[in-house]
């Protein structure tokens, strides 16, 4: 054992690492916005915890706490910043009240698809901007999973014109809520546990959640027959957060383990959600023929796009960094979208109907 430890000491000294004795166990806690049972949103933290334990031989333990434990679903950033928890899992758009620039690391209406966004994050300037935005919180942020393109929501009545949006009571948070509000929608943000009852009783007329994999479990189809395709969250990225000081104290190999595990868990969650939604969509079409799947008419979509641009331009006029990130994303998306139209959409369009 002594000879093995001596070898490790030599390796750390040579390569500038930080030595952790074979008897030391590093224990971290991770707080997430979601209940522990809400898969696949809650899947990435557990995946990271399992991978880290296995890769470190049980010497690096990350204990995962769902919101049922810490009771502060929207307090994750503050808890990680203040080192109540070394890590957190949430979504960046929840911190728009602290810094509007955080929205760019979740999604924006009419923005990039999941693959386009990951390409921007990892092979464009995305991670550079993420670091810049989160530095002020003394927190490191990393991609933490993705729901893919989300559905546009459940509606009690059909939306045929822009006028139909006026006076509509809808649960739709974040930037999309601001966009809808400009078109006369009465926007509200109701906790997930109250959504079904609110829709059933007519407290709200419509809501957006995620997609068929999660929506059918909530039972929305029982009280709102119109299910609209999306526009507002073309790629909804989650995030891991790490307290900067806690991270800096880690040995280099543990830092590498963390980055590897987070990246793997992030990709796995996207695949898990896609698979779950594909199965749920097929089952939904068979079991609930009363559901009317719709897309918003072109005039409504144009109004939503115009409203989106106005909201973004409003923030850009007051915030130089916001404007810079927006321009950077648009430039990247211009190239990425051309390939998306060929690589996936082109294939589907070309082979559609071929048996």
Language model: regions and residue ranges:
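N-terminal secretory signal peptides that target proteins for export/translocation
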Residues: 1-3
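N-terminal secretory/targeting leader peptides
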Residues: 23-117, 129-355
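Bacterial N-terminal signal peptides
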Residues: 6-17
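Bacterial Sec-dependent signal peptides at the C-terminal "C-region" and cleavage site
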Residues: 16-24
